[in-house]
Each structure stands twice: as C-alpha cells, then as structure tokens.
C-alpha cells in the first residue's frame, strides 16, 4: 500500500542525523523541510510518498505551528539507505530528531501513521498528541482478523517475491492499479504514481514487509498521550465498497481497542489518501483535533 509542490517560503533542509552528513559516512534516514513558527508538528508521509502530500496541511498550519515535513530515505527520489531493519531505523532516527527539536504533535499517514504510533509506544514523552491518518496497528488483520506475525510470513514472502520480479512496466501498472483504490482523482493518482516510480523498489519491499509483519495492537496500551485517528470510509475494490461506514468504524475500534485515550473519526467518502480525497473533511477534522 502507498502512500510536487513549492511553497513561497524557502524550506530549511536538514538530515535525519544530529551530525553534519559531511562528517558522517552514514546516509540520512530522511530529509526534512521546516516551515512556519510555533509549536512543532512532525509530519510523516506514507509508503513511497513524498512529504509533499502534506502541502495543504502546511499551508493551513504554518502561521501557528512549526511544520517539520519528512520524506523518508528511498522514497520519492530520496537516496536509499542500507541500514536494516528499515522501519526500526526510521523509528530510531525520527525519535532522535524529535528529541533534538522538542516534543510536539506527531502526525503520520499510512506507514507514517504506523511509525507515529511506534514512536509513542517507545517514548510518549516525545509526543504531545498523535494524529494518525488511515493507519492501523496491524495491517494484516484488516483482511484476516485472526492473523498473527507468524501466520503472515508466507504472504509477506510472496509479496516480496512478486514485487522484486516485476519489470518496470509491470511495476508501474501494479502501482497505478493500487493507487486507483486509494485515490479518486486522476490528477492526484498521477502525482502519487510519480512519487512511487521515483522510489527505490527494494526500500518499498523492505518497508512493506516490515509493516505487514509488525503487530502493535497490544503495545499501543503503553501510549498515555491523546491519539486522534482518521480512517478512510471508502475501502473499495473494482469500484465496489468492501465495508459500510459502520463496519469500518468497527474495524478501527477493534484494532485500537487497547489504546485508552483515543478519538476515531471516519471519512465516509474518502479513500486512503484522505487529505486528497476529501480535503474539506480532513482539514475540518484536523482543526478539531488540534483544538482539543
């Protein structure tokens, strides 16, 4: 699952390391563009996505917040890294970055939402509140409620094999088909497809494999800070909705049942990229979350 713009302000580009990269052989785990001033908001995009997915969000928040917009290594044209496991590397270096710049609101979409949860689990003193955009503690259990980290091993290995063996034409077609289930507007599909095709395929496979096989459903009980969760109500395949709004709400409640202080809101008509599919609902709901 996945997940080109320029603001008038010139962004500050920093790496996901505390040292000057020229003095450190380790490649940065991410780049960051910083906009505005105020309390920090850390914005993490999803799989194979650019930080540009937060363009509209930054425009609305930069007068009140200092927006730290990440693009993860290997995605949307950013140089990949060799450090593994990929997701644990991202979590550690994101935590180091937040620790260096001050606790704040951590907001993530898709894979970024998963990382936001994982950061709060590891050290919720870094997180004043979490805003999760269409992400779940255990992705595999959405389709297979009885799934465990062990039982999804075969599916994970099959996914890795299939994606690795595709040629570029097959991969583009597969990504376009997948994105069409996640975004309604063709122009936005093409934007996300461009990010995906600029991404390093090995990084996509490694990140997706880790996401499929990491279950945070029990661990989220450790989170004591407020967590606000937006979920897409339009989960479709071949143009047909798979779940009603009520069923989507139930799925989210089940996945997040061990999280004590939470608010779950369903964007009834939006697909996975909620900020693209229903921006009015997204920004209205986001403002409510920020004001609480």
Language model features with spans:
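Bacterial Sec-dependent N-terminal signal peptides
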Residues: 1-25, 227
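Conserved HGGG/HGGXW glycine-rich cap/lid loop of the alpha/beta-hydrolase fold
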Residues: 33-80
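Active-site loop/oxyanion-hole signature of alpha/beta-hydrolase fold enzymes
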Residues: 69-107, 111, 276
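Short glycine-enriched nucleophile-adjacent loop
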Residues: 113-124, 130
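Flexible "cap/lid" loop of the alpha/beta hydrolase fold
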Residues: 121, 129-165
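Conserved alpha/beta-hydrolase catalytic His-Asp/Glu region
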Residues: 163-219
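Conserved loop-alpha-helix segment in the C-terminal half of the alpha/beta-hydrolase fold
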Residues: 227-270
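Catalytic histidine-centered segment of alpha/beta-hydrolase-like enzymes
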Residues: 267-279, 283
């Amino acid at each position: 699952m996945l997940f080109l713009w320029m603001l008038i302000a010139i962004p500050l580009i920093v790496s996901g390391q505390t040292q000057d990269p020229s003095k450190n052989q380790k490649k940065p785990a991410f780049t960051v563009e910083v906009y505005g001033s105020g309390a920090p908001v850390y914005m993490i995009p999803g799989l194979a996505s650019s930080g540009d997915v937060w363009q509209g969000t930054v425009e609305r928040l930069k007068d009140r917040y200092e927006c730290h917009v990440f693009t993860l290594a290997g995605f949307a044209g950013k140089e990949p890294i060799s450090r593994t496991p990929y997701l644990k590397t991202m979590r550690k270096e994101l935590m180091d970055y937040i620790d260096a710049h001050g606790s704040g609101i951590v907001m993530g979409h898709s894979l970024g939402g998963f990382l936001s949860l994982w950061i709060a689990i590891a050290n919720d003193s870094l997180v004043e509140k979490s805003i999760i955009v269409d992400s779940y503690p255990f992705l595999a259990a959405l389709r297979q409620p009885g799934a465990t980290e062990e039982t999804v091993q075969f599916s994970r290995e099959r996914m890795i094999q299939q994606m690795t063996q595709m040629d570029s034409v097959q991969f583009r077609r597969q990504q376009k088909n997948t994105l069409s289930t996640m975004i309604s507007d063709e122009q936005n599909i093409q934007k996300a497809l461009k990010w995906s095709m600029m991404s390093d395929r090995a990084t996509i496979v490694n990140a997706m494999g880790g996401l499929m096989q990491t279950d945070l459903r029990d661990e989220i009980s450790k989170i004591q800070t407020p967590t606000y969760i937006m979920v897409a109500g339009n989960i479709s395949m071949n143009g047909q909705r798979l779940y009603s709004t009520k069923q989507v709400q139930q799925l989210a409640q089940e996945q997040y049942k061990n999280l004590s202080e939470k608010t779950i809101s369903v964007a009834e008509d939006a697909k996975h990229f909620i900020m693209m599919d229903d921006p009015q609902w997204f920004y209205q709901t986001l403002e409510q979350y920020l004001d609480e």
